[in-house]
Amino acid sequence: MPRSSFSPLPSNLPDGAERRALQLLVVDDDATQRSLITVAAKQAGHEVTVAPSVAEAIEKLRTARFDCVTLDLVLEDGDGIDVLGEMAKAKFGGAVIVISGMDGKRRSAARSFARSVGIELQSLPKPLDLAALRISLANLGKTAMGLPAMHTWGGVATDAIVERHRA
């Protein structure tokens, strides 16, 4: 059986600091995308809950606490913007990573809406760049502990990867 080519990112944690698993909600109606995101997050040591629809996402957000939500913009029963609206009403304080096949203009509109309701988000296009997702999750874990985001992938700073996918 071939070995996985995935190796965890170095922690860059100060001595004595412990990594904390993020509570992640994956909202995507595409089973393959949900699986990819779930596997990457679990490999990084995070706890994952999935919601394949707007209705399930809203229900899970009402009944559990999440550090981060990955969110597709187009779902069978509605729009990811609807989920962002519900998150704003609930004063969601976690991170949001939009992962969508929609064009940059639509992802930018989602980011603008999110900012207008007090939510900051990152945006990654489909097909998903797993390295960028892993970096984003690693940095979220660090910032949740009050540490600066420091991870890079292949010598490229995280901010450069995320900025490349903005707009």
Q: Which residues does each PLM region occupy?
A:
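Acidic catalytic/metal-coordinating carboxylates
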Residues: S53, D79-D82
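Conserved acidic carboxylate
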Residues: D28
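Non-catalytic signal-transmission and effector/linker regions of two-component phosphorelay proteins
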Residues: M1-L25, T38, A131-A167
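Short hydrophobic/Thr-rich beta-strand motif most characteristic of the beta2 strand and flanking loop
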Residues: G45-P52, K60, L124
